[in-house]
Amino acid sequence: MQARRLSLCCLAAASVVVGAQAVAGQGAAPQQGVTYRSPSGTTLRLMLDETNLGNEASVGEITFPPNQDSGEHAHDAIEIFYVVSGELEHVVNGKSQILKPGMSGFVRPPDKVRHKTGPAGAKVVVVWAPGIEGRRVASRWTREP
């Protein structure tokens, strides 16, 4: 029950972030957080993490370039995606779901997940609970100036 409430709180936090960006207009919203880049060019902007929210959850914005495949992996936390733009193929334990703008998907540990994009790439808001997972993902990527 506590995990479900935490997940709902995390999703609400993501909704606030997305809503604020929509009200401000695309590209006009001030940038919050620290951005990291993976070797494949995917970026993660951690907006809420242990520095300003604590360890309960972290919220980020991930921009996947066109035609990317994350490879199968697992997380030590619940991962919730909300698609802002583009399309994301969200494959959980071999079961594929195409997520379009306004749709969400999730994965629980120890599920295996894979994220794929088509020619348009994708921008998503991601919520991890517990929040240390956001920092764990970012630790393998390069911090942007």
What are these regions (language model features)?
Residues 94-110:
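Short acidic-glycine-tyrosine-enriched beta hairpin
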Residues 76-88, 93:
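Glycine- and acidic-residue-biased ligand/ion/polar-headgroup-sensing regions
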Residues 1-10:
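Bacterial N-terminal signal peptides that target proteins for export
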Residues 58-75:
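Conserved short histidine dyad/triad with adjacent acidic residue
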Residues 54, 109-134:
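Ligand-binding loop in jelly-roll beta-barrel domains
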Residues 69-70, 89, 105, 109-115:
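Histidine-centered metal-chelating micro-motifs
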Residues 16-56, 137-145:
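A short, N-terminal "cap"/entry segment at the start of jelly-roll beta-barrel domains
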